[in-house]
Amino acid sequence: MTAHREAAGTAARAVGEGTRIVTLADRPDLVTAVPGVLDSRWPRFMLAGRPGHDVDLTDLLVRAPQHQVLLVDATDEVRGVGLSVPLEWDGSVADLPSGWDGAVTASADLLERGGRPNAACALSITLMPAVTGQGYAGEMIDALKRAAASAGAAALIAPVRPVLKARYPLVPMEQYLTWRTEDGEVFDPWLRLHLRVGGEVLGVAYPSMTISGTVAEWRYWVGMPLPGDGEYVIRGGLAPLTVDRAADLGIYREPNVWVVHREQI
């Protein structure tokens, strides 16, 4: 195995025995491992469908390597990724991007015109199943916050994908946000973690992410027949899939929750 040394003064940080978090700027050679991590957890349609933006996401992430964080184990295998992009944001709810797709589009435009970002937007934190539940999720949020701060950002915003929402796809996100545990905490554990480490809910982003495809493509992605027009509950979807067979089109419009981290940025 080839030995690698992270650049001094970067965001590289030990988070466990032999496990560390590095940025893509530290280890550009690890970019090829990112798709495999995403594929281990993301629903197939989120990776294969046509997104609601025309940005080459891999190119965008590579152009902002200091904003991408990787969880690397003792064998130098990538076990988790945290993806974020630079943005301009005035700090108000009104100036938030339209959602996940909007953040990707705005960041690509910013980099294309050479703008000066003052914020960062987290797109995803994804952990391989083998390391889930070991406390790394909070470390990855912290790593994205530190990466944002190192880049001069005043805030890290995120269109959060609540982890349990897929169990309740017919419940409006606004209603889902009001749910509480018996202890009075926010019901969703992923949102709850964001709040515990200093995040603040700003509101619902809808539609945050739009994915489209033909009826045949959707049938393959979701593994079920789609015999008529209308809405379908699909595995991994936070909201129903809408199918129009005459147009040979399926559209999935996902709601997310805007969260901002301002403290310690």
Which role fits each region the language model picked out?
Residues 133-150, 155-158:
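Conserved acetyl-CoA-binding loop-helix of GNAT-fold acetyltransferases
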Residues 195-203:
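Conserved acetyl-CoA-binding loop of GNAT-fold acetyltransferases
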Residues 66, 253-258:
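Short hydrophobic/aromatic beta-strand or adjacent loop that forms the aromatic wall/cage
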Residues 191:
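ATP phosphate-binding glycine-rich loop and adjacent ATP-lid/helix-beta elements
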